[in-house]
A protein has these predicted regions:
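Mixed-charge (Asp/Glu-Lys/Arg
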Residues: 1-39, 44-175
């Protein structure tokens, strides 16, 4: 299991790589240390002609990103504390929030998956619902766990889709 320091380094490297990639594409990108807690973003990218977009970054060294489904879906336990009851999707934490999922590799071989927060939410909620429905909404090992994971293969259609961000912010430079 990764240490707290290793997780912080992974996150920091991911944020700086995303900021650098956005700058290469003509945006002015500013990473924050960690994220802006209330607003849930890690980077603000601004166009040279105005406008900006908030970006949340999630980086990994291995095969899957880890999430708490409650950030994406209202979930609570039934009266006996075993069955999960799935409610409505959570509101987007920041308007038009973009997400960049990063797989850290050797220098120059990193992978970037760019999607809207709502697209990420849809992927996670659909997979979580399908998983729980197989077990009548009672998690087999730890009924009260809200953990979910997203494999690289789940987001491959979003790889290198930088235009999803670039199209939201006016820029005078070509990508």
């Amino acid at each position: 299991m990764a240490t707290g320091q290793a997780n912080k380094l992974t996150g920091a490297v991911g944020e700086f790589l995303v900021a650098a990639e956005l700058c290469r594409r003509g945006l002015l990108a500013t990473p924050f240390a960690g994220n802006v807690p209330v607003l849930h973003y890690d980077i603000i990218a601004s166009g040279q002609s105005g406008g900006h977009v908030a970006v949340q970054v999630k980086a990994i060294n291995r095969h899957a990103w880890q999430f708490d489904i409650r950030k994406f879906l209202d979930v609570h336990m039934d009266e006996d504390g075993k069955r999960q009851i799935l409610g409505a999707p959570q509101q987007e934490p920041f308007p038009e929030l973009m997400c960049v999922l990063v797989v850290l590799k050797k220098t120059g071989q990193d992978r970037f998956f760019i999607l809207e927060w709502k697209q990420l939410q849809n992927l996670l909620v659909r997979a979580y619902t399908e998983y729980l429905s197989k077990y009548n909404f009672v998690r087999p090992r730890v009924p009260g766990s809200f953990h979910t994971a997203l494999a690289i293969s789940d987001v491959e259609p979003f790889e290198k889709k930088w235009a999803k961000i670039l199209d939201r912010v006016p820029s005078t430079l070509m990508a």
